[in-house]
């Protein structure tokens, strides 16, 4: 009886492997990721362009919103849920904030009710959640200034390594020099500068800096986590002309595997970004345009409730 039971278990495992091949994810990392982009036919607005893209090799499906931040009719904001549990879907964000384009924002604790943001959440010059200043990894405490995405009311975008002190935000021109087993045990604020933004959100790691790929996994203490691996992704960046680039890539699907951080950085560079940052990914990665979900988060048409988002709205 015991042998028969074991044989049945083996048969079930074989069937699962055959029926669900995505469980055996392609872990190869690609250095060239050509994507064929085409503009989506939707209710077009000046200053907002929505493209969908496909790469058949990895394979991946991707969507990108390109925002002209110099357009006076466009507002770019970090928004946060005011529901009792501090979470809502992107479609709800879109409706409640009258936003044309919405993508998910920073990390949050899904097991908390109400949920809590992981790191800085700064909206309309008010701190909703303080900057993450240190964390424990391998029984050691690391002080870190993680990557943050910031917006000014005039439309300017910035990406920097950010922390806070006495209710003020500070950025470091270079990341705090953490590495595995070599923690930095305090901040040297003499190396920092005041970060003057109106909205900001911690996420990370930074993917690009000064026009080059620079993924600060170790410095931001993402080593030893699942963040660098292949996942559905959301990323933000900006071009030399100031245009904001918001990217969403589906993953965990037969026809869209997702990407690792290096692949994500390559795609953002190919989109002409000079600075870029990884945002919350996995089942949270989604883009809503005119109130409609345009991607398939983790292969479904349902939306995960998230705490924060980036919203593109038209001024009345």
Place the predicted regions along the sequence by residue:
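Short glycine-rich loop/turn motifs
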Residues: 60-64, 146, 202-204, 231-235, ...
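A short "linker-to-beta-strand initiation" element
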Residues: 162, 167-172, 203, 211-213
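Bacterial Sec-dependent N-terminal signal peptides
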Residues: 1-31
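Flexible, D/E/H-enriched segments
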Residues: 28-52, 215, 292-316
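Structural recognition of the beta-strand scaffold that forms the well-ordered cores
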Residues: 100-104, 150, 158-159, 207, ...
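Zymogen propeptides
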Residues: 25-167
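Short, conserved active-site entrance elements at the starts or edges of catalytic domains
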Residues: 180-187, 195-223
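Conserved, well-ordered active-site substructure
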Residues: 112-137, 218-275, 284-316
């Amino acid at each position: 009886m015991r042998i028969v039971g074991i044989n049945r278990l083996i048969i079930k495992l074989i069937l699962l492997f055959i029926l669900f091949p995505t469980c055996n994810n392609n872990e190869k990392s690609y250095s060239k990721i050509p994507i064929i982009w085409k503009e989506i036919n939707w209710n077009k607005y000046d200053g907002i362009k929505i493209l969908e893209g496909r790469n058949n090799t990895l394979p991946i499906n991707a969507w990108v919103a390109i925002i002209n931040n110099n357009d006076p009719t466009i507002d770019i904001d970090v928004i946060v849920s005011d529901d009792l549990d501090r979470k809502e879907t992107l479609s709800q964000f879109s409706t409640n904030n009258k936003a044309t384009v919405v993508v998910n924002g920073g990390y949050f604790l899904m097991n908390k009710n109400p949920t809590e943001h992981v790191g800085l959440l700064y909206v309309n010059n008010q701190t909703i959640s303080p900057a993450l200043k240190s964390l424990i990894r391998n029984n050691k405490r690391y002080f870190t200034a993680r990557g943050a995405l910031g917006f000014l009311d005039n439309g300017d975008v910035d990406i920097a390594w950010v922390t806070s002190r006495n209710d003020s935000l500070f950025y470091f021109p270079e990341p705090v020099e953490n590495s595995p087993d070599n923690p930095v045990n305090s901040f040297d604020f003499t190396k920092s500068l005041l970060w003057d933004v109106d909205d900001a959100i911690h996420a990370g790691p930074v993917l690009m800096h000064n026009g080059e790929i620079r993924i600060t996994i170790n410095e931001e203490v993402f080593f030893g986590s699942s963040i660098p691996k292949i996942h559905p992704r959301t990323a933000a960046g900006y071009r030399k002309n100031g245009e904001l680039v918001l990217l969403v890539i589906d993953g965990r699907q037969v026809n869209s595997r997702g990407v690792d951080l290096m692949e994500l950085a390559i795609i953002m560079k190919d989109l002409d970004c000079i600075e870029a940052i990884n945002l919350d990914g996995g089942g949270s990665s989604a883009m809503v345009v005119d109130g409609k979900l345009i991607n398939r988060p983790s292969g479904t048409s349902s939306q995960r409730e998230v705490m924060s988002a980036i919203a593109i709205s038209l001024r009345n």
